[in-house]
Structure formats: structure tokens, C-alpha cells
Regions:
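Zn-dependent metallopeptidase/amidohydrolase metal-coordination segment
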Residues: 10-11, 269-271, 346-400
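Midchain, well-structured core segments that form catalytic/ion-binding scaffolds
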Residues: 126-139, 171-295, 299, 308-310, ...
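Short helix-loop-beta-strand segments that form the rim/entrance of peptidase-like active sites
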Residues: 153-175, 256
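Active-site metal-coordination/substrate-binding segment of hydrolases
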Residues: 67-161, 391
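A non-catalytic alpha/beta surface segment that caps or lines the substrate-entry region
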Residues: 22-70, 74-76, 80, 91
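Active-site-adjacent substrate-binding region
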Residues: 236-253, 260-262, 309, 319-368
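Flexible, glycine/charged-enriched surface loops at secondary-structure junctions
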Residues: 19-20, 48, 161-164, 247-262, ...
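N-terminal capping segment at the start of a domain
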Residues: 2-28, 129-130, 318, 378-379
Length: 405
């Protein structure tokens, strides 16, 4: 099966994760794709194939005879799609020989614009896959899943010699818990790669430090005609909290290694309000200062109004894997060599996000991130080219060849 056929098949499954649910998987629907992948791995002849009760899929392609002493390598992608935008009833648009112009997304009437996504120019002449504008595409990370599955199939059919190859597909990466129950006692790779990036030829090993922060605000509600010096409007306190953070330190005003505070949602009324943020920074010390800023706001609000008006809850999400990877640079060197072998110059940028690999690297499994060839993730402008996916398949195969040398 061709890589694009797999992608179109996998995106037909609704696998949006649920950031409000603390169990794994956060949405039972992720099992539908998990069962499909489990069966496909079995059909390809892999061993130790399992779908766990928590929706992790594992499989082993055993080493070619005479190659059992070579390092075991793993490839990992996630099955869920981001809750930021609908992932239900995805209707991809397939555009052969893309002309390099803006693309009409026929379901919504919106346009995928070159002015917003300049990399579109580089995809001219390729087969482009987009959304119809009413959902995200799900290339993040079903493109990665497709590329791994296709690479495994080609390694088998082309009889490429290899050491042990472990495959892992996770739930709930998009809500920060994809690595929580990843079984490293079962998945016995020496090192691995997530296939969850964007740029073709990308190998990323520096990501954000990340946390979520929630302000719970309890107001005092009385009749507005008798409210003087009594009422505390929780919704207005929430607005005040937002105003105390620097307005130029948001995702819309930052790039590269610049961190941010991101207001993800705000709900409430006079009696109760909730303000949710995610906090990101590549530098660990600066990241901790950001969290201290939030704690300072909590203290200030409780001093201004009364104790327990505001309660802040901070949850750590993941750390910058650079801290671990820079001590084990061989995993990046292998990926860069593989990328050069397919005719590309490796791209390594600080990832303005996180991957399962960031968590796994701190758990003992070194795990940089490879590009899938997709762009515009988490929304209706998500797109990918067939040729970009083919390149990712080739990179995976080259990594396998290099580790078997």
C-alpha cells in the first residue's frame, strides 16, 4: 500500500483526544485506529504485536539473520489528533500537479494561502493533500504513522538487512500524556525516533519546556443594586489576570527560541471563572521564571480581593530533550546521515512544541524527532505532499540501513 493510501485510510478514523479527560486514552475512539494498526502489523508478519488496554500499539520486526547484534532502533508516532479543531469526518482534497497558487478549500470557502504558508511554493508540481476547510487533516500525526508502516513494508519486501526494529503508536500525544504509559520494558529499542515533525529533512532535538496553568476564580455574587464593596466579579478578575501578562509574549508575537504565555480558554460568570494557559520556553531558567510570574499573580489577586479568590494549578507537561540528547549526539548524527543519503540537507530547528520523544528521552529512550513533510498542523490549513511523505519513508529506511552497518 502506498504511503498516501495509508494516510487517506487513517484520517478517516476520528481520533481526537480529549484534554479534559485524565484517563488514557482520553477518548475511546482512538482504539478504532489502534485495532486497525495492530492488524496491519500482524499482516506484515511482525512479532510481539499488541494493543494494550491503554491504546498503545507495539510491534517488532526481528533482525535479519546475522544482524541480531546490531543496535535495535525504534520508530514512534501518535494516533490522536489535536482537540484544537474538529477531526471528525475529514474530507481530504487531493490535488495532483499542484500549480503553486492559493488553494480553495471547498467545504468552507476559505483559501490555503501562500502568503500564510510560504513553503507552499516549494510544493509546486507535487501531489498536494489538503483539508476541505471544515476539519483538520490529521497528518499530525497520521502521516508519521503512514510513513512508518510504509517503510516497514518496504524493508520487508525489498529484503533490506536490519537489526531489530521496534514500532510504537501512542494515544494522547496532543494532550501531553502520550508517553505516560509507554512500556519501555516491552519496547526494547536502544534508541528511537518519533516521526512527528513537519519540514522534510528535519531532525529535531530541542523542544519547549512546557506546563499548563489553570486559574480557578471564586467570586462573590450579590444583587448589582446592592453590590458596592461586596461583589467580586470572577469574570472581571479573570480579565485582570490576563492583563497582567506581557501582551507581546504570546504565540502570535514570538518565534524561534522565544517563549510565551498562551491563553487557551476562558469561561465564567460573576460567581466563578476559569482561565487556562499553557506556558512554553526553551530555556529552563526562563521557563521557571514564567511559572513564578503566574504564582505572583495568584498572590497579588488574593491580596487585592481576599484569600482563596484565586487558586492556581500548574501541571508540568514535558521538558527540553536537548538536555539529554546533547550528551548522546550519535542519535542525531545517524539521522543527519540518513537525510543526506536521500539528497537533502538536514534541518534542525528548535521545536516550538513537544513530542512523545521529549518525554521518552528523559525516561531513558533517546528519541529525536523526524519531519513528516506536513505543514499547518492543528487546523483547517493543514497540508502535506505525497512526495514529502515518500521522502520521510526513505529517511526511515536509511536510518535502518545505517544502524545495520
Amino acid at each position: 500500500m502506498r504511503v498516501e493510501e495509508r494516510l487517506l485510510k487513517y484520517v478517516s478514523y476520528w481520533t481526537t483526544s480529549d484534554e479534559e479527560c485524565r484517563q488514557i486514552p482520553s477518548s475511546e475512539r482512538q482504539f478504532e485506529l489502534g485495532k486497525v494498526l495492530e492488524q496491519e502489523l500482524r499482516d506484515l508478519g511482525l512479532e510481539k504485536v499488541t494493543l494494550t488496554d491503554h491504546c498503545y500499539v507495539y510491534g517488532l520486526l526481528p533482525a535479519t539473520k546475522g544482524y541480531a547484534d546490531k543496535p535495535a532502533v525504534g520508530f514512534i508516532s501518535h494516533m490522536d489528533t489535536a482537540p484544537d479543531f474538529s477531526g471528525k469526518d475529514v474530507k481530504p482534497q487531493i490535488i495532483p500537479d499542484y500549480d503553486g497558487n492559493d488553494v480553495l478549500l471547498k467545504g468552507s470557502g476559505a483559501y490555503l494561502k501562500i502568503s500564510d504558508f510560504p513553503t507552499l511554493k516549494t510544493l509546486k508540481g507535487r501531489t498536494l493533500i489538503t483539508t476541505d476547510g471544515t476539519t483538520l487533516l490529521g497528518a499530525d500525526d497520521k502521516a508519521g504513522v503512514s510513513e512508518i508502516m510504509t517503510a516497514v513494508e518496504q524493508i520487508i519486501t525489498e529484503k533490506i538487512p536490519h537489526g531489530d526494529i521496534w514500532i510504537g503508536f501512542t494515544p494522547d500525544e496532543e494532550v501531553g500524556s502520550g508517553a505516560d504509559l509507554f512500556d519501555l520494558d516491552y519496547f526494547k529499542a536502544k534508541f528511537a525516533y518519533t516521526v512527528d515533525g513537519d519540514y522534510e529533512g528535519e531532525v529535531a532535538y530541542e523542544n519547549f519546556n512546557a506546563a499548563s496553568a489553570s486559574f480557578e476564580i471564586t467570586g462573590v455574587n450579590v444583587h448589582p443594586g446592592e453590590a458596592k464593596d461586596i461583589m467580586i466579579n470572577a469574570a472581571l478578575v479573570g480579565c485582570e489576570i490576563a492583563s497582567l501578562l506581557p501582551e507581546n509574549e504570546t504565540p502570535a508575537h514570538t518565534e524561534g527560541r522565544e517563549g510565551f504565555y498562551h491563553l487557551t480558554d476562558f469561561s465564567g460568570d460573576i460567581a466563578h471563572a476559569k482561565v487556562n494557559y499553557i506556558v512554553r520556553d526553551h530555556d529552563k531558567a526562563t521557563f521557571e521564571k514564567r511559572l513564578d510570574t503566574l504564582r505572583g499573580i495568584e498572590k497579588k489577586m488574593n491580596e487585592k480581593y481576599h484569600a482563596d479568590t484565586v487558586k492556581l494549578n500548574i501541571q508540568h507537561s514535558y521538558s527540553n530533550m536537548l538536555e539529554v540528547i546533547e550528551k548522546n549526539e550519535y542519535v542525531v548524527a545517524i539521522a543527519k546521515k540518513a537525510i543526506k543519503n536521500v539528497g537533502l540537507e538536514p534541518v534542525s530547528r528548535p521545536v516550538r512544541g513537544g513530542t512523545d520523544g521529549a518525554r521518552l528521552s528523559f525516561m531513558g529512550l533517546l528519541c529525536p524527532n523526524l519531519g513528516t513533510g506536513g505543514y499547518g498542523f492543528h487546523g483547517p490549513f493543514e497540508h502535506i505532499s505525497v512526495e514529502g511523505m515518500d521522502t520521510a519513508v526513505s529517511v526511515i529506511k536509511e536510518i535502518v540501513k545505517i544502524t545495520a552497518e
